[in-house]
């Protein structure tokens, strides 16, 4: 069976990772883990984009060779992954020979087919975005948007890829593949963009202006445009491993959906006769008090500051709980602390402590067998009978924020159940019926805790492993079975305590 192949965008090796980079990696890792739990074999790719004018300029400014510069930056991105408990199967760099070979082969194929031609171009160029601009890119007052940085007018001969030739095909493809881009409104934005005629894509830069790139195979006086180079990574990483391509999903930011991924990439593949990816997930931006968080605006947050203070699982939980995939979301230290304290420490952490403490205190540290389920137990089981299937269905639609909300509601209900049953009171009673209720309550608490962490293990894997360990539980291979209420923990010895989410000694970073 073909592996479920999922990719992040590769990160541009021109600066340090920020919250947006971390979110994309965590989101993709959560999807990959979720699919593995469903029984799929998964191939998860990430990496770094290492060519282009900005890299060349940054290296020169530091007085070092471009390769040395990208080696250091790429390692910084690579080092981020284990800190976030993100576990890709492959990490590709566009300076690797395996990638450069495939880029050159693809360029030669398109050139031989007449899809690439040489022509003189006169127009405006953005160094920051490393792209040629059109008049429609201007602001209404005639100025250039700030995102383009310095814009200069140039005249030079270059090689162009025939985008416009395939525009009608792309429109037809998207119209006949509803839901190809997630969320659906992003696909509508792509089709809206395609209502205007496409310009052919300049896919080269003269070596006299840019040396740091992959030379064109048919003219070594030019190097490849960084976007054409970078997009090929998804294919070059697996082309020598039959059965993995096509990608099932590219997970990218909304800012690189149009035109790079939804126009350039799809047309490049179509023109070359290569099967298209099966879908694109375009996530939103993290804002900080309403402003986009990015390197260029200077308000980018270092994700490792949060990980160092609160741990990878708390960070992963917040990202998945707070952002609806595809929408923008605002990050504030205050909101992070609210989620951390109210949901992780006070809700989940409290249930863990109660379960371990009371099992140790009233049952000698061994999970009892549930005996006579009464209305409180039945109500909690009925709630889980709705919650468990919802977690799976929501995950299949990438609605992890809602799945976490439902799971935490179940944890809240379990804590309310504990208050209602009051094991500390039942433990003082000599009535055999109360002793049976006590044993049933302790078994119910432990089982509810096991189910809750099973439902969140793709988001908070470290926490799930710790909780299972203190419950003496080794999860089975079939995740759906782990989500079924049962008496799996009866007879297990539990640890007396586990501190999962300690109170922070200082506020979250600003």
Give the ranges of each region predicted by the language model.
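Generic structural concept
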Residues: 345, 349, 381, 385, ...
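A glycine-rich phosphate-binding loop feature that marks nucleotide/adenosyl-phosphate handling sites
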Residues: 124-129, 284-286, 335-336, 370-375, ...
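Basic, alpha-helical terminal appendages of large translation-related enzymes
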Residues: 1-3, 17, 43, 47, ...
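Short, charged/polar, low-complexity loop and linker segments
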Residues: 328-333, 385-393
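Structured secondary-structure scaffolds
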Residues: 1-46, 98-102, 146-361, 405-407
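Active-site rim elements
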Residues: 93, 252-256, 439
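Conserved, charged catalytic cores of large soluble enzymes
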Residues: 1-16, 30-44, 48-203, 240, ...
